Amino acid sequence: VHSPGGGQYYAAVWCNDECEYATPWFAFTDDAAEQDAAKTAMHWWAPYMNDRDLPIPSSLISEGTDYWNGAGDRGDASMFLYGSSRYFLTRGELPAEEAKAQLAWCADYIERRIASDGTVLSDTDELENRLSSGDANLSTSAISYGAFGVYGVLLSRMGEKVEAEKCAALQRKIADGIEKTFGARLTGEDCYRYHAGLDEVRAWICLPPYMGIKSRADGALNAIGRLLWENGSLKTTENENVVWDRSALYYIAALFRAGRADEAWARLKETAATRLLGERAPYVVEAYPENGMRHLSGESALFCRIITDGLLDVGFTEEGFTLSPHLPAALSRVEVKDIFLCGGRRSFTVDK
């Protein structure tokens, strides 16, 4: 079992910490305990995927025997579908029957939450009402967009071509919804509002660029860097001094993916100096000022994924994987050894 940790959260799993953040990283390592932990997390959720159209719980506690869902639907099905699909794509495995049914359940659940404008409805996001999120928020919609992308590739590998094409159509619908509903010009940048009626910049506007939506990527990343970057991390919103490291880690990976490698490298070095080598060594933290900046291991998996998802920009096709490296000027060569991709350990060198 992999649990968030932090001196408090043990024998429990969360849809964001375990399924969305950690499971995709575990797939690359080929560590036996981590593979067990990834599949344990998936398995524990199986009984909660129901025929009553109820959201899955945000967290399963006490070794999966009970649950917590105090914030309602946080977009947890989207988190599960995204992270679990990526796990199987990275491993080069097809899901067994239980996992296959779980992925299909999540896809159906998300589809039923797509509003007429193309956004995906949820009660809140992973911040659980600490900040406003409206009836539909950018995080849930962007993760859903990414989830249908990777799930569609997995379906293609499974020979489910019609269902894969349906995923592509749902992706397009959500992308249109994100543009129409959340697209906005804020602080002089063509970027996104986090939910309808909100005109302040939020850190999670980095998610569409991370998930591959390019239309407002530069504006969103510009706004974040100018207004929210501070001391090696991101403020969650421009009007409050609240920090959640997870968004900073997605942001750095998004900078790499957007081709802004020098900027990404500078941000990564600053984060490493502050978090890994500085006063909060040796891990990134959950939040400030909440809970004394405790360490959570799921966020640390996101730090590792800056390299795989950002600098190397690993992608997936029906046949295998792709690499689209983004090397900053400071690096002339990158060597990767014993990374697990699509059925085996691989080593490769990236030269400019």
Feature names for model-found ranges:
Residues 1-13, 39-72, 107-136, 173-246, ...:
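Extended glycan-interaction surfaces of carbohydrate-active proteins
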